[in-house]
């Protein structure tokens, strides 16, 4: 095999050599190889060349192909990093013909029937086989103990069906060599919500899933008011047909529901639900918070906020997200991703003269927007419903990575007033540049088809957007999708305040795509292609730490030693001796070199709130919480996130009794003792960072313990 090779990454006027871990991950995950394992991409430059060529081939004339090949290659060399599926699979059809360039999908609505449950298992199996992550909502399934008339029996409930999807995902990902990713969402008003909260407590159960609750505004307000909360499930339309349904009965409430067919629906589009149980809202809230405090799940999706701010509010009802949560999507929805490496635009880093090159940044974002739009044409999605969705709306999610590293390079502390100002500005410029490109592309290539469609104004539409009534619209009027998108989307109304003329033209012409931005966690592309710049919107976890990575053929995760990009850059450009926590005065880092543990949960939320103003989809972000953080204060983080208009909130508190994280500090490992029982019954205790010989391999004690406990040992 050709030896792996990466050039250095530019850092100011000099270059920062790639670390071994970055080179290794590129070679294992993103470098194109033949089925025999021979490298097709000799260098990273050849990887970028392959991607640029594949995406420029979408253009319609030889002259355009040549022009945009050159520009795409320039953007890739100046901070544009497409998501992993694009880097891996674009231009790779000769070697991987059945793979997709799409990271994010959501299943079609899982209807409450055995036929549809199993149909969706089949569809999701094909989706995972293509390399995509997938999300589902499972609260559409009737609660445990519900009568199934066709079978003359009682259902085992949603959790048991989730087990089927979990086993399918594990089997498909084991066969395909790439671990599958799934998200399960669940309504906070479903009668089985307590079971969902505890679903992963059993070792090894549902480990192919992330879990998130769909938290409604009504529920949060009930918690704040110390009120009651009704758990309910939709009433079948058959009751109305039989004349046994009473809309005014005390046990009937009306709720937004993803599926209308087969249920009783009022004029506002709400579904009749029968209450099965009433609980104190704070009791349910405390149960959610306790689980999140100890187990980091379930996640917290403010679903009413998601739908209120959805650009496609007029034609979608979102109930699920991709596995990492940065893309709330409709049934069969898909979204491709890309991130701009912010560290590439810092000039004169670590000096008083440090500044951000806005012109170069905006040029990269503009070119990258066209590049990502071209990915739609080579999406490789396996299902016709997915193809129709992505071609009709042309969603993509551009975000950034390296925010924490960039702030450090500019001398700002993450969470400070200066950092909040920069976060809003860098996100706003990404958004406005993207929407200007959306208009230019629509004029050149045509808008997203959904925005050319005519829509009939309904009572539900006027209920959601009362300003339409003030503008003279009435039920039955016909209005273009481009108008509903550009004029009445809550997000696009903010764009209009920045640039009224742009919004007016988007309403008239239509945008090339309905959505432009989201911020992904970017774990492996940050580590590899960005030389371990901080993930997504996050600060650096630490400046020198261990990362647990899956290795093909290895029976547990491997602990890899890594350095933050800003530390590498500082050592290369300023002080070669510098190291974190050094007692040597000549080796100490500046005080603005902070990490995730130095940042309060409130500061995490504040940063996310500044970015969310200009991100039209969502943001994957984790607020790190100290192990000893008081539970009552922990609960306040989530209320604060709600008050700050976030679409979701995720926290992580180190708890070695429950799981081993992807990112691990050496001090945490050293301070944690793991107990193993040998075949002869003898018990041994070892520190988490100690190495153990087991089954012919060397493992860190923490990773071996986790693999054995969770049941994935030897199955990667």
Residues of each region from the PLM?
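Active-site cavity-forming subdomains of large catalytic enzyme subunits
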Residues: 3-17, 102-358, 381-389, 434-476, ...
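Short secondary-structure subsegments characteristic of cysteine-rich extracellular domains
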Residues: 45, 49, 417-432
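Long, charged, mostly alpha-helical binding arms that flank functional sites
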Residues: 334-398, 408, 582-588
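Glycine-rich phosphate/pyrophosphate-binding loops
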Residues: 130-142, 179-184, 410-418, 618-621, ...
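Core structural elements
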Residues: 18-26, 73-94, 188-189, 369-378, ...
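Active-site-adjacent structural elements in folded domains
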Residues: 87-92, 358, 382-393, 406, ...
């Amino acid at each position: 095999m050709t030896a792996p090779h990466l050039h250095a990454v530019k850092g100011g006027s000099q270059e920062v050599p790639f670390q071994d871990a970055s080179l290794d991950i590129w070679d294992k995950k993103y470098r194109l190889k033949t089925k025999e394992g021979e490298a097709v991409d000799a260098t990273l430059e050849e990887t970028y060349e392959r991607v640029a060529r594949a995406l420029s081939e979408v253009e319609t004339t030889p002259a355009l192909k040549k022009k945009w090949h050159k520009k795409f290659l320039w953007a890739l060399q100046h901070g544009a990093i497409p998501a992993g599926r694009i880097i891996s699979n674009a231009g790779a059809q000769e070697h991987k013909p059945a793979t997709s360039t799409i990271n994010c999908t959501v299943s079609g609505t899982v209807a409450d029937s055995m036929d549809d449950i199993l149909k969706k298992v089949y569809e999701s199996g094909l989706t995972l086989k293509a390399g995509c992550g997938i999300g589902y909502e499972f609260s559409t399934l009737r609660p445990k103990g519900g009568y199934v008339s066709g079978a003359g029996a009682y259902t085992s409930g949603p959790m048991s069906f989730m087990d089927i999807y979990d086993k399918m995902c594990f089997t498909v990902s084991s066969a395909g060599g790439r671990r599958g990713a799934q998200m399960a969402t669940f309504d906070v008003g479903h009668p089985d919500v307590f079971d969902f909260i505890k679903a992963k407590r059993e070792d090894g159960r549902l480990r192919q899933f992330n879990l998130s609750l769909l938290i409604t505004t009504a529920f949060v307000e009930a918690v704040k008011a110390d009120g009651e909360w009704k758990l309910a499930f939709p009433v079948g339309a058959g009751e109305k047909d039989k004349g046994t349904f009473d809309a005014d009965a005390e046990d009937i409430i009306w709720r937004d529901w993803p599926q209308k067919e087969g249920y009783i629906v009022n004029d506002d589009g709400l579904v009749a639900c029968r209450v099965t149980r009433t609980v104190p809202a704070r009791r349910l809230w405390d149960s959610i918070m306790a689980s999140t405090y100890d187990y980091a799940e379930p996640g917290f999706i403010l679903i009413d906020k998601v739908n209120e701010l959805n650009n496609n509010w007029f034609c979608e009802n979102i109930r699920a997200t991709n596995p990492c949560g940065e893309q709330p999507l409709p049934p069969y929805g898909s979204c491709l991703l890309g991130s701009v490496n912010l560290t590439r635009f810092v000039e004169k880093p670590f000096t008083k003269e440090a500044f951000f090159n806005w012109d170069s940044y905006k040029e990269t974002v503009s070119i990258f927007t066209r590049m990502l739009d071209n990915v739609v044409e080579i999406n490789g999605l396996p299902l016709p419903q997915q193809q129709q969705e992505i071609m009709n709306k042309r969603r993509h999610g551009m975000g950034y990575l390296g925010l924490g590293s960039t702030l450090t390079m500019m001398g700002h502390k993450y969470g400070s007033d200066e950092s909040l100002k920069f976060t809003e500005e860098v996100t706003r410029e990404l958004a406005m540049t993207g929407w200007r490109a959306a208009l230019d592309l629509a004029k050149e290539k045509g808008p997203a088809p959904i925005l050319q469609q005519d829509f009939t104004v309904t009572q539900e539409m006027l209920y959601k957007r009362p300003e339409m009534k003030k503008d003279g619209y009435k039920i039955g009027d016909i209005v273009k999708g481009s108008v509903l998108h550009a004029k009445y989307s809550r997000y696009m109304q903010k764009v209009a305040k920045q640039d009224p003329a742009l919004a007016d033209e988007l309403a008239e012409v239509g945008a090339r795509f309905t959505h432009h931005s989201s911020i992904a966690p970017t774990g492996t592309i940050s580590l590899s292609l960005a030389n371990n710049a901080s993930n997504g919107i996050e600060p650096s976890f630490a400046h020198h730490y261990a990362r647990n990575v899956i290795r093909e053929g290895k029976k547990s995760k491997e602990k890899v030693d890594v350095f933050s990009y800003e530390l590498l850059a500082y050592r290369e450009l300023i002080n070669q001796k510098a190291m974190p926590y050094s007692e040597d005065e000549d080796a100490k880092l500046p005080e603005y070199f902070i990490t995730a543990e130095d940042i309060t949960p409130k500061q995490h939320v504040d940063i996310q709130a500044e970015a969310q103003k200009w991100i039209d989809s969502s943001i994957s972000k984790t607020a790190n919480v100290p192990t000893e953080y008081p539970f009552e204060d922990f609960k306040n983080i989530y209320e604060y996130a709600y008050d700050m208009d976030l679409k979701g909130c995720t926290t992580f508190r180190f708890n070695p009794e429950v799981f081993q994280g992807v990112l691990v500090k050496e001090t945490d490992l050293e301070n944690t003792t793991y107990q193993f029982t040998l075949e002869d019954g003898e018990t041994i205790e070892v520190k988490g960072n100690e190495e153990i010989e087991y089954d012919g391999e060397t493992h860190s004690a923490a990773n071996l313990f986790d693999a054995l406990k969770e049941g994935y040992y030897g199955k990667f």
